[in-house]
Amino acid sequence: MRIFMKSKLLVIATTALLFAACSDSFLDRAPEGNYVDATFYTSDEALEAATAPLYNRAWFDYNQRSIVPIGSGRANDMYSPWNYPQFVTFQVTALDENLSGAWSGFYSVVTMANSVINAVETQTQGSVSEAAKTKAIAEARLMRACAYFYMLRIWGPVILIEDNQKLVDNPVRPLNREEDVFQFIINDLNYAVDNLSEQSDKGRATSWAAKGILAKVYLARSGWNNGGTRDEGDLELARQYASDVCENSGLDLMTNYEDLFKYKNNNNQESLLAMQWVPLGEWYECNTLLSDLAFSTEVTGGVNCWSSYNGSIDMLQQYELADTLRRNATFFTKGSYYSYICIKDGGYTYKGTASPIKKGVPGGPDDDNDGKVKQMNSPLNTYILRLADVYLTYAEACLGNNSTLSDGRGLYFFNRVRERAKINKKSSITLDDIIRERRVEFGMEYSNWYDMVTWFRYLPDKMLNYFNNQWRGYRTDAIIKDEDGKLHFGKYDTDGTTFLEGPEYYTAPEFTINIEAEDIFLPYPESDVIQNPLLNEPPVPYTFNE
């Protein structure tokens, strides 16, 4: 088993130093200067190409499948009794393939980032500029921070790694404390803030992306295991970084929410950081999620798909009556129409009585996708951070330890998100308002669970009560929509025309779901525990080099 672990790390480290394959963005830009040999970089362009896999190959194992049940299923965005229901119902075991896929996927990001940093320090020569070296390290540290921020909110204590060779030499490593994981993330992000530029080639990270993520990290840390209050110092830092992005970046929300999820709007003005997938790309460079998300070939132009996911009862109940733009962009519901799907037929209207996934399903190859749709190959990027996320982070940081927020720029930016959805502004907001707004804004973007864990670490009793009142594992035979657009949940009577509405007509799970504090964080994959028994031991302090 130890030999296998060494081999895997070496493959990951080597892959990080290969050039990414083709696309029409920075990912396929051939370097004007090339290597002295296979591992030495002699130009800025060659070094820039070496960081390109950090935007796709590094994230592939996580994005390939695990991202959906962990990021959205765990949050109860959607449910299927046939597609990884254990994440919704909190029945995940250490043997789960998506669990191990996420663990290995995040460490692919970490070890690939480490490899880039090592290459900059030991494998550059010739005309490579100091600016190019610093930028490459900053991009690598940003991605490493993102990976660890995800891991912290899935497992809590994790293993911090800066030197791949030390891990290869001794793969039995202890877990590190959550407070040290936070500090490691912050150190990486501070470096990225200081050394990335405010503007970059499309798809490349900027200092604004680093600041936005840093704001989220400080907000998360402010209440993490802090006895039900938020640390004012961390709140102030969260406000400062979020405010800087909101007020000074010059970026703005996309006008139309639905446009965020169309292929030709990849790397739009609202996209601060995203996984950059190659349309029609090879394995490890492509977004495989299309077939897992799309419910029928009628919305993929005949491309094979197999999703049985539907929006959960609880998720669909979060949408206000007027919030049809975001609901329709996220889920198909009866009567919802899409002009950009089945274009040659005049558009597509969903006529069913379920709630299949819409977000992540851009249509078929003959729609407005330039032919770049095929089985397990979507042309869409995967968002890591959108500007709307920073807006809501700013609002929550401004709310801080108060029960309500009734004025100021935090409320203004909260309402900017609602204005885009064409729903009424709020004159004051609470944490409950922020929780609901986040859920509908980022539904099926594989991020809601991570925010829920942050709130759980801040207010555990509140969030346990929330989780246990989400109708987890429940489903309905039919969802209908009345003339006002309101959804009704239930089933049709035996006559086929009388609709029976209400919880008594829901289909309940076969077992009682009672979520407790020890259920929130996922187990470490059993295969890794066998390789590294220290995963069963208490975490230890990390020795920082900076």
Swiss-Prot record:
<dbReference type="GO" id="GO:0009279">
    <property type="term" value="C:cell outer membrane"/>
</dbReference>
<dbReference type="InterPro" id="IPR033985">
    <property type="entry name" value="SusD-like_N"/>
</dbReference>
<keyword id="KW-0998">Cell outer membrane</keyword>
<keyword id="KW-0119">Carbohydrate metabolism</keyword>
<dbReference type="InterPro" id="IPR011990">
    <property type="entry name" value="TPR-like_helical_dom_sf"/>
</dbReference>
<protein>
    <recommendedName>
        <fullName>SusD-like protein BACOVA_02651</fullName>
    </recommendedName>
</protein>
<dbReference type="GO" id="GO:0030247">
    <property type="term" value="F:polysaccharide binding"/>
</dbReference>
<comment type="similarity">
    <text>Belongs to the SusD family.</text>
</comment>
<feature type="signal peptide">
    <location>
        <begin position="1"/>
        <end position="21"/>
    </location>
</feature>
<keyword id="KW-0564">Palmitate</keyword>
<keyword id="KW-0732">Signal</keyword>
<keyword id="KW-0472">Membrane</keyword>
<dbReference type="Pfam" id="PF07980">
    <property type="entry name" value="SusD_RagB"/>
</dbReference>
<keyword id="KW-0449">Lipoprotein</keyword>
<dbReference type="Pfam" id="PF14322">
    <property type="entry name" value="SusD-like_3"/>
</dbReference>
<dbReference type="GO" id="GO:0085030">
    <property type="term" value="P:symbiotic process benefiting host"/>
</dbReference>
<feature type="lipid moiety-binding region" description="S-diacylglycerol cysteine">
    <location>
        <position position="22"/>
    </location>
</feature>
<comment type="pathway">
    <text>Glucan metabolism; xyloglucan degradation.</text>
</comment>
<dbReference type="InterPro" id="IPR012944">
    <property type="entry name" value="SusD_RagB_dom"/>
</dbReference>
<feature type="lipid moiety-binding region" description="N-palmitoyl cysteine">
    <location>
        <position position="22"/>
    </location>
</feature>
<dbReference type="GO" id="GO:2000899">
    <property type="term" value="P:xyloglucan catabolic process"/>
</dbReference>
<comment type="function">
    <text>Polysaccharide-binding protein present at the surface of the cell. Probably mediates xyloglucan-binding before xyloglucan transport in the periplasm for degradation.</text>
</comment>
